[in-house]
UniProtKB/Swiss-Prot annotation:
This protein's UniProt keywords: Ribonucleoprotein, Ribosomal protein, RNA-binding, rRNA-binding
Keyword Signal: no
Identification of the protein by name: Large ribosomal subunit protein uL15
Gene name tied to this protein: rplO
InterPro entries in alphabetical order: Ribosomal_uL15 (IPR030878), Ribosomal_uL15/eL18 (IPR021131), Ribosomal_uL15/eL18_sf (IPR036227), Ribosomal_uL15_bac-type (IPR005749), Ribosomal_uL15_CS (IPR001196)
Organism: Kosmotoga olearia (strain ATCC BAA-1733 / DSM 21960 / TBF 19.5.1)
Length: 148
């Protein structure tokens, strides 16, 4: 028999039988239907997530700490290893070229070049920010690191 959507069945024993509750006392799951007597869990409905029974919940006991700076610049980060792979000796690299070649998806607040990886080609890199190691590595091979 060939496989098709209409004859797919779960492997025998892979799906547990459903628990049939409230079907008489001789079933073993009658009367209280495994819910016990009294208490919050005996009725219908669920307790909402993180509800701790009325005590002050954890998220309110822990102090508020820190904040998100609204003026912080969010740079798109590129490592030297990426520039080494994609560009040839003597190329001028600008954020617009990086967008064209689909190395970055968007500009956000600008491009920052980081120093991960080795650089062997002399490149002219124009970006909004450079890490100290990136600038040193670019200039060590005879390239230029220009801040826009």
């Amino acid at each position: 028999m060939a496989f098709s959507l209409e004859n797919l069945r779960p492997a025998p024993g892979s799906r547990p039988k459903s628990k049939r509750v409230g079907r008489g006392s001789s079933s073993g799951k009658g009367k209280t239907s495994s819910r016990g007597h009294k208490g919050q869990g005996r009725g219908t409905g669920k307790v909402r997530m993180f509800f701790e029974g009325g005590q002050t919940p954890l998220f309110r006991r822990i102090p508020i700490k820190g904040f998100k700076n609204r003026n912080a610049k969010e740079y798109v980060i590129i490592n030297l290893s990426t520039l080494e792979e994609v560009f040839e000796e003597g190329n001028v690299i600008t954020p617009e070229i990086l967008l064209e070649k689909k190395i970055i998806k968007n500009l956000k607040d600008g491009v920052k070049i980081l120093g991960k990886g080795e650089l062997t080609k002399a490149l002219v890199v124009k970006a909004h920010a450079f890490s100290r190691t990136a600038k040193e590595k670019i200039e060590a091979v005879g390239g230029k690191a220009e801040v826009i």
